């Protein structure tokens, strides 16, 4: 009996000791090397890099082709509009939005208005990519699984753009109202003024994107007529771009591509012939002479028509040795001094803004001289590629800012199309609105002679979020490549 009594006391003592120890269990068992919270300074650069890489990869694989900047001579499904799932933008936007949401929550809790503003700008740009690519997408319910929203509704594109414009305005107003440095920023290195310029420049882009659906003149004028309150890009120094490194693992995405994969992509005849007609010095930056003439005294440039079948594309003009490849600045020379200055990740540039303002001024939506904006855009594009604008360039009939309003708008759109070469998906997004230049689907296209205007929704959405997916399709139109989204209707 005494033995049992002693054992019972021992058990009780052990229980008491265990209970006492558990009071500090969380503190004792917290790994100091595994943080439970990640700072905005660590989250921000990863968001920026991942989004830039996604956009540049999608542009290389599909965006440059559909806008007829490049063409393919092998594995030509993309060029013939045989598009399957294209989920890069979708996945990257919604994956990274979780971290953007964390930055928003942390910045609000800590009174960090600069970080909040940057997060709102990133959110706005990211959702603009998603809705520009697919149309209606989850927006107000996105990244709300922790709050119990496992089946987010698809917001209308109109509501998304209203939200984007509101967030960009809020961001512009917030920037500079707190003192914290924007540590971790790999786009503007924490420059608050440049972030403010980006917010307002993106507002101009967004307003012009929806300008066929409502009168945007008052909103545009409120920005352009008040530079002290709403500054915009003033030069190429303000370009919202990501500069890659010369060393791994942060090199330009194509620098480490297999040479065979890189060389499947060739100059599009549409763009190359245009550059040759204009004797445009950007041509040898964008493209290389044919391999057969590359090292000769008389280099020859030849582009491939878009939309050829595999046999015709590979054999065009006598074969790959007689077809121009993409410039080395986007491949092996991407880590050179010149390559680092040109082969970047793109959000928006000063040249694009000037072309948007030229269009707006020509249409009477803003004050200012359309010709000046137009020529600023052309000059900025040449300057970005470290080139001087040819002295007679603005005297060329195809370039000179003269003619009817329709002819002037054609020239604005045409030069913007050239300037947006491999600058993300913007050339395609913008072309769908303007129709400039007048592109023709390739002879062997598989899309009923129509150039696609959107991506299909990811198949997983039909399986996991079927009701929301169906509501979006019923509202927007069939889930195919040709259904026009709200601002295109």
Residue ranges and their predicted role:
Residues 1-30:
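Bacterial Sec-dependent N-terminal signal peptides
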Residues 38-40, 68-122, 126-384, 402-409:
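Structured, solvent-exposed acidic/aromatic patches
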Residues 21-77, 82-84, 91-94, 102, ...:
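Membrane-proximal, proline-rich intrinsically disordered regions
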Residues 150-151, 388-397:
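Substrate-binding clefts and substrate-entry loops adjacent to catalytic sites
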Residues 21, 253-277, 283, 287, ...:
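Long, intrinsically disordered, low-complexity segments
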């Amino acid at each position: 009996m005494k033995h049992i009594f002693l054992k019972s006391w021992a058990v009780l003592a052990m229980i008491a000791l265990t209970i006492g120890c558990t009071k500090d269990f969380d503190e004792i068992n917290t790994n100091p090397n595994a943080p439970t919270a990640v700072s905005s300074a660590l989250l921000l650069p990863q968001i920026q890099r991942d989004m830039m890489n996604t956009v540049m990869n999608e542009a290389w694989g599909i965006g440059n082709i559909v806008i007829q900047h490049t063409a393919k001579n092998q594995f030509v499904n993309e060029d013939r509009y045989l598009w399957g799932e294209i989920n890069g933008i979708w996945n990257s936007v919604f994956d990274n939005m979780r971290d953007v949401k964390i930055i928003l929550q942390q910045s609000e809790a800590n009174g960090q208005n600069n970080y909040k503003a940057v997060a709102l700008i990133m959110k706005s740009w990211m959702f603009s990519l998603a809705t520009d690519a697919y149309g209606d997408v989850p927006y107000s319910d996105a990244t709300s699984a922790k709050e119990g929203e496992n089946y987010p509704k698809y917001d209308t594109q109109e509501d998304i753009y209203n939200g984007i414009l509101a967030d960009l305005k809020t961001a512009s107003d917030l920037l500079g109202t707190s003192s914290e440095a924007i540590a971790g920023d790999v786009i503007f290195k924490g420059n608050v003024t440049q972030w403010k310029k980006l917010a307002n420049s993106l507002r101009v882009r967004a307003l012009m994107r929806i300008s066929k659906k409502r009168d945007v003149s008052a909103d545009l004028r409120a920005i352009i007529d008040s530079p002290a309150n709403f500054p915009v890009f003033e030069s190429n120094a303000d370009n919202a771009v990501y500069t890659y490194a010369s060393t791994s693992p942060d090199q330009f995405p194509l620098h480490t591509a297999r040479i065979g994969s890189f060389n499947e992509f060739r100059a599009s005849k549409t763009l190359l012939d245009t550059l040759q007609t204009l004797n445009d010095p950007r041509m040898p930056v964008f493209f290389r002479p044919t391999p057969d003439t590359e090292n000769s005294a008389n280099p020859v440039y030849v582009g491939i028509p878009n939309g050829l079948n595999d046999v015709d594309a590979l054999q065009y003009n006598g074969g790959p040795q007689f077809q121009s490849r993409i410039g080395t600045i986007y491949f092996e020379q991407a880590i050179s001094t010149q390559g680092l200055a040109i082969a970047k990740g793109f959000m928006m540039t000063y040249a694009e803004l000037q072309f948007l303002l030229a269009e707006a001024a020509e249409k009477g939506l803003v004050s200012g001289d359309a010709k000046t904006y137009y020529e600023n855009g052309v000059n900025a594009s040449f300057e970005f590629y470290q080139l001087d604008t040819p002295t007679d360039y603005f005297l060329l009939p195809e370039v000179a800012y003269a003619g009817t309003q329709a002819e002037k708008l054609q020239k604005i759109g045409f030069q913007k199309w050239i300037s947006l070469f491999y600058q993300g998906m913007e050339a395609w997004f913008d072309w769908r609105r303007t129709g400039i230049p007048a592109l023709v689907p390739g002879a062997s296209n598989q899309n009923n002679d129509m150039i696609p205007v959107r991506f299909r929704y990811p198949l997983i959405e039909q399986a996991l979020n079927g009701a929301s997916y169906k509501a979006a399709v019923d509202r927007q139109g069939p889930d195919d490549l040709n259904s026009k989204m709200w601002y295109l209707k």
